[in-house]
Amino acid sequence: MSCRQFSSSYLSRSGGGGGGGLGSGGSIRSSYSRFSSSGGGGGGGRFSSSSGYGGGSSRVCGRGGGGSFGYSYGGGSGGGFSASSLGGGFGGGSRGFGGASGGGYSSSGGFGGGFGGGSGGGFGGGYGSGFGGFGGFGGGAGGGDGGILTANEKSTMQELNSRLASYLDKVQALEEANNDLENKIQDWYDKKGPAAIQKNYSPYYNTIDDLKDQIVDLTVGNNKTLLDIDNTRMTLDDFRIKFEMEQNLRQGVDADINGLRQVLDNLTMEKSDLEMQYETLQEELMALKKNHKEEMSQLTGQNSGDVNVEINVAPGKDLTKTLNDMRQEYEQLIAKNRKDIENQYETQITQIEHEVSSSGQEVQSSAKEVTQLRHGVQELEIELQSQLSKKAALEKSLEDTKNRYCGQLQMIQEQISNLEAQITDVRQEIECQNQEYSLLLSIKMRLEKEIETYHNLLEGGQEDFESSGAGKIGLGGRGGSGGSYGRGSRGGSGGSYGGGGSGGGYGGGSGSRGGSGGSYGGGSGSGGGSGGGYGGGSGGGHSGGSGGGHSGGSGGNYGGGSGSGGGSGGGYGGGSGSRGGSGGSHGGGSGFGGESGGSYGGGEEASGSGGGYGGGSGKSSHS
């Protein structure tokens, strides 16, 4: 249902003759032009015309009537919901709710009544009675120029119409947007949903395995190359260390050789000293020999002189022998000393050489041992370095593998987070769309209920018109006729906005001696209760007073009970009369055991319940 189908105005202009029945054009169309009318002069059936609450006269109609709610809620001269003599009903004349000579909702007699009179409607009557009396809301020759719905009410109706149309437009637009979003969500799920994500990658498994094997082989080869490079570097370091150690060993041997050279120099110097001593002793020996020879020669020369001295002395020693003995003794001593010196020298040289050789062997053995130990240390250090390098390479490879897998895991986590965020956004969007859809659905249901209520009200009004007819509405039990929105019982004319026995909504009841109504109607007579909304017997506007006389019932919204034992009034109406039933919406029950009134109407004097927009009248009459 769109607002374009609702865009027709409630108040359309048309001319021509009246229609029949539920008529020519129908009361409910797709364009909802319910209150239009094509009435003009004359007309046959009830609730006829193109559509709306209008129609010509029927049986009781006087001169004829145009459809109500037409151009100005009126037609030619009469027409409407009910009429008595010349015309009446809900329209008449040229404007307003009154007819040319009659009008109003109902009239009890005379030329007119109800809401309009004269040539222009308003709330005043022409020659007939208004709300139960002669004048009603207005007397004289005519009333005001406006109808029952003022300009504000018309604008309100138009505004409500436009708002309803805009609501329906908005509902349709939101439904279309919702459908578009659902289609988009479905497309997204089809493209990027779990079904789209879970693709068949089985043909690529062999290629992936081959690539993985190649990656593993390349990684192993790379690691082997790195290990070879590290081993080569360690071997180079090993040779460098060996070179340094050999160089240090050579320097140590050179230092030992230099030390031995110093020892050899010392020994050579001692040998030279001993040789010098030997030469000195040889020279001394030669000097002693020379001196001895000279002394011997001197002594020999002295003995060769011619001196004869004869001395009687003891025989002397042989000096030659003594000298020879001394010479031999000295020679033996020199030889002994020389031999001792030579032996000592040789012994010292031998000892020194033995010490030098032994120390050299010890040095060589120590150097060999040191070299072996250094080689062992170097081998251990090389092995340690190789193990450390292998450990560092493996740790680096492990760290690279961890970093690579951590990066891949982080990428997967980011993808998962992005997908979760997208899913969360989609869920939130779906939730918002569901909330908006629920809200729009509730608004749509509420609007459909309101439209259904309008339909029911319209159909109820049509059924009441069809069932009761303009004639039944026009004739009361003992007096005036009961019109739409009210009815008469024992006196003046009944109906809303008019006084009667127990008028429905927008009106109050009046007894057998019905007085004039208050604002929009009032109750009086035989201890009648106070009027309903917008007036009453003694009640004020918009509030029903309590029932008077013989236990009258309390008034309801915009209405009140009246009469003896009257029931409580419903919305816009109230019960009246003895043991009157409770009033319905915009109406009420009335008269001696009357049943409860229906919407916009009520029963009277043991009659059945009134229908929508009308009510039963007369004794033993039924809706």
UniProtKB/Swiss-Prot annotation:
Residues 323-461 are annotated as: Coil 2. Residues 208-299 are annotated as: Coil 1B. Residues 153-465 form the IF rod domain. It holds the Pfam family Filament. Residues 1-25, 462-496, 534-623 are annotated as: Disordered. Signal peptide: none annotated. Residues 1-152 are annotated as: Head. Induction: Induced by intrinsic regulatory mechanisms and by extrinsic signals from a subset of dermal palmoplantar fibroblasts. Keywords: Coiled coil, Disease variant, Intermediate filament, Keratin, Palmoplantar keratoderma, Phosphoprotein. GO terms for biological process: epidermis development; epithelial cell differentiation; intermediate filament organization; skin development; spermatogenesis. InterPro entries: IF_conserved, IF_rod_dom, Keratin_I. Residues 14-25, 471-496 have a biased composition (Gly residues). PROSITE patterns: IF_ROD_1 (PS00226), IF_ROD_2 (PS51842). May serve an important special function either in the mature palmar and plantar skin tissue or in the morphogenetic program of the formation of these tissues. Plays a role in keratin filament assembly. Belongs to the intermediate filament family. This is Keratin, type I cytoskeletal 9. It comes from Homo sapiens. The lineage of its organism: Eukaryota, Metazoa, Chordata, Craniata, Vertebrata.
